[in-house]
Amino acid sequence: TIMKLEGKVAIVTGGARDLGRAISVKLAAEGAKVCLNYFDNEADAQETLALIKNVGGEAIAVQGDMTKAAAVKNLFAECNKAFGDKVDVLVNVVGGIVGRKKITEQDEDWYDFLMDVNMRSVFLCTREVVPMMPAGGSIVNFSSLAARDGGGNGASMYATAKGAVMTFTRSMAKELGPQGIRCNAICPGTIATSFHDRFNTPENRERMKASYALRREGTADEVA
C-alpha cells in the first residue's frame, strides 16, 4: 500500500489521549514520523507510543505546557533532533473547556487561562513551525462548534477562545497560502471523549445526541 505521508514529519499537540491520540496513530499509520506533545500524563503518552508501534509507525513523545514559549521551542527542537529540521504537518489539539462558569463567576485568571490554553498555544506553535514548514505543509487547528454557536451553558470563554482560533486560522490561510502552506480549522460538536465524561452531564449528552442527524455522538477516530 502507498503511504500517503511517507517521509513527512508531524507534530501533534495534546497528542496523547482522545482526539490527539487518534490523530497521532492515524498520521503514523499513514507513514508520518510523529512527535506528540503531552502536558503531564506520561502513562497516556506511553500508551499512545505503543499503539503507534503496533501500526508500524515511528514516534516520540515530548512533555510540555504549550502555553509557554520555552516549552513550545523545546518541543520543536526535540522533533528536529529526532526527525530532521522540517515539520510538514502541525495539528494543534491542545485546548479545552476546563469548567463551566457564568459571566459573573469568571475572574481574570479564568479568562487568561481559557484564552491561553485554547488560543495562545495555537499562536505559539504556529509561529514556531512556519520557518521550518516546507511548501505543501499543513496546519490543522482544533476550534469547536461552540465557536460558531456561542457554546453551551457556562462555556462563554471557551467559545470565545475557540472563535479566536477560527479567525486566526483564516488569517493564517491567507498569509501562508502563497508559501504553499494550508491552514484549516476543524469544529467538532460532541465527540465521545473523557473531556465530556468530565465536563458534561449524561442528560445533556442525550439531549445533544437527539439534535444530531446521526442521533449519536461522534468518535475520536471519525475526527482523525
Model-derived regions: residue spans:
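Residue(s) in the substrate-gating loop at a strand-loop-helix junction
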Residues: 144
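Conserved glycine-rich Rossmann-like NAD(P)H-binding loop of the short-chain dehydrogenase/reductase
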Residues: 30-47
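Active-site helix of classical SDR
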Residues: 126, 161, 169
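Conserved glycine-rich cofactor-binding loop
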Residues: 9, 16-17
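Alpha-helical segment proximal to the catalytic Tyr-Lys
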Residues: 131, 174-178
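A conserved structural motif in NAD(P)-dependent oxidoreductases
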Residues: 212-223
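Catalytic Tyr-X3-Lys loop
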Residues: 88, 104-123, 140, 165, ...
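Conserved mid-core segment of classical short-chain dehydrogenase/reductases
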Residues: 73, 96-112, 131, 153-157, ...
